[in-house]
Amino acid sequence: MAELNLKQIIDRLNAEFTGETRKLVFWYDDKAEFFEDMETVELQNAKIYYLQPDNQFYTKYFLERVDKTTNYLIYAPFPKPDVRDNHLEDTMLYSRRFFADRASLLSVDLGIEEKYKPVIEKHIKFFANKERTQRFYDLEIENFNEENILVGLLSAVCKARTCSFEEVVRIVLTDGELVDNAFLQEFEKYDLLSAFWQLCEQHFGYTDTKPSLERLLVTLFVTYTGRYVQAELPVAWKSFVSYKSGNIIAFLDSLMNSVLYRDKYDALSAHVAKGLNVFSAFAGMRVDDLVECDTFLAVDQVLVKWLVGRLVSEDIGAIVNGFTIPELCEKRAKMHFGRKTGKTYQLLSSAYSMVKEADYHATDGLKPIIDRYLAADYNMDQQYRKFYYYYDQLESTESFEPLRELVENIYTNEYLACLLPAWNAGIQQDAAFSVIPLQRDFYNANLRYTKERTVVIISDAMRYEVGQELFARMQDDPKCTAKLSVQLSVLPSYTRLGMAALLPHKTLEMTDDFQVLADGILCDNLAGRQQVLQSYNPDSVCVQFDDIKNLKVAELRDVLTKRQIIYVYHNQIDARGDKANTEDEVFNACEEAVQEIVDLIHRISVSGNTYHFIVTADHGFIYKRDKLTESDKISGKSADKAFANRRFIVSKAALGDDGIDHMSMGRILGNEDSKMVSYPVSSNVFKVAGGGANYVHGGSSPQEMLVPVLEFKMERGHMETKNAEIALVSIVHKITNLITSMDFIQSDAVSDTVKAAKYRIFFLSEDNEKISNENSYVADSREENAQKRIFRMRFTFKNKKYDKDKQYYLVVYDEESGLEQWRQPVIMDIAFADDIGFGF
């Protein structure tokens, strides 16, 4: 029992024992409601004597013979016996009886009107436990009526933090079993079960001769579905459609959109879907009728199956309810089940981009080819990469195999087979090496005259389309100025030669034993590259990405301090692609490489006092998923001593076989080298032992030779951050009390990338009248446990008549920017005494 009630009882008991005359007071607590409380009761002028059913004779003897002077409260935690069985009846004739009407005490203490006291009396058993009673008090119900009392009792049983029937239903459905539900058993124990089902009818329109949670759940999901599916529902479902669809939609929306409860929603949805066999039902409907519905995952399964069929049929003009295929994919990925289906829709969107270019025709001339590649064709490589990136994350790929085969065929036999011969015809032109900047001129073009400290990140095998994704990522940062350009790599396009070309040099050469020298210095390792770099700029250094990525701030500054140029060698893509057992992970490596570089740039710009960055690569790559056949391989045998790779052969004499072209190393390196590099005109490879075969580089193609040059200038002291956001946890759509408490959650813990924010939270009418107090909250919690980021706000509403036809909103404003962050509509239903007609 709440402490204030107990104080009332103690005050009344103390009043019984005033005066000089000895007094005996009998208190028969029929239901032992106060038995727990008696341990804490101390009377000012009396002692407490505990009467037992079997010690009446001794009690009579004690009170009338042993201690005849002390005042006693004789407390009996059981009903008073009949006169014939009560051996203390004569003692009671000269004593007094004390009656503690718990229902009356509770009503007075809580401010419940007399006419609602019978509701308390009916459920008085609930208040026999102090913890339960305190939970009822903690709900802070302001205006009591029959419904509020019953909802409060149900809320307290469920340990809800707010007096809300929607919250009660949420807890019952998500925290309990559908059969043998522990909460329903507790409701029945306190005579609240019938009230629960009547409230379900009032709020959700659910009624049944034998109500059950299973059928309630089906009613909720079928009614919700009926509002968003444009087709007629199956006959067997129609009996479950409720007339209270608005309340049901608001309730299920709150579940599915809550970061805390969305997984519970998914489980309930899957349960109902299985029972109703919804996939079969939806499979018989037009896909146009399903676009707006996200009640069940089965909707997406039906849509995905249809989309795969359209793409395999190369029906890129298909329209679904006004949406093109990529528009539909984007829309569905943003809906509730997008967390589970988003990758599938991304895959389908990428496949669409590939299928759209199935009839690919290359242009002639190197400059037009490069211009077109930079403007559009790079996207074919990017979408192919994205397709497999998401494909590899699918739990089951069987149903996507026909689409995968189509994508693979388009990429290999339509795109690469057409583009690469045109490229290799163009690169033989006399002016080919003057169309775009050359990799061997990188230092002079980008670093020779720089005055500010610059970090150069060389990401091994970052081809142009991956660089374009990095560019797009950095462009999203408002404090970053980003530029993307391109340069033509050396040929053969492999690591040792590409890394050397990126260093400053007067001469670049390949020896007869195929060593690569810059200004006569062997530079196939970090020490050699640093020697070359420091010969041009003593205030420079070469470091490995893995050696600096986890350095503490002080250690990082030690690396950067007094340096003007820092070459950082990053090897994520090539490290995975160049090994036969990991080459199929190369597209994952591309994603990781972009993220690692973004993180490093942000970290150095904030902690390393360095704000100028250039990102480039030694070479690109070609990757095809299907295993190579013998027809994809070229013998490529050279009579001379040769440096052979799957995509190139360097030897004294050029190879003259069909499908092979060649170029002098002197032309590539800008010297008199007479050695020849031979390479496949197509995406085919030479027959060479060792290594993988699907991931290759070293040859002549846009994918291998067009490498990105990205320049980023960061604003000082800036790290890409976002504000810590807040969201509503409590499922509250109707305000029924002038004082209402709600639970919110800070969505993310404050960190290096999530900064604290201050919010103003209050309620508004549609006329912008503020109808509640305004709460301020500073979202600055660093707790990783989401439950510990939940906080409670108390709102006091204006005591006025609210128009049920008007819109009212809970609104959240960012205090710093003054911008509204979000709003949620609520119904104002402040119940006054004369308005009630609940009828239990």
Q: Which role fits each region the language model picked out?
A:
Residues 460:
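Ligand-binding pocket scaffold of soluble enzyme catalytic domains
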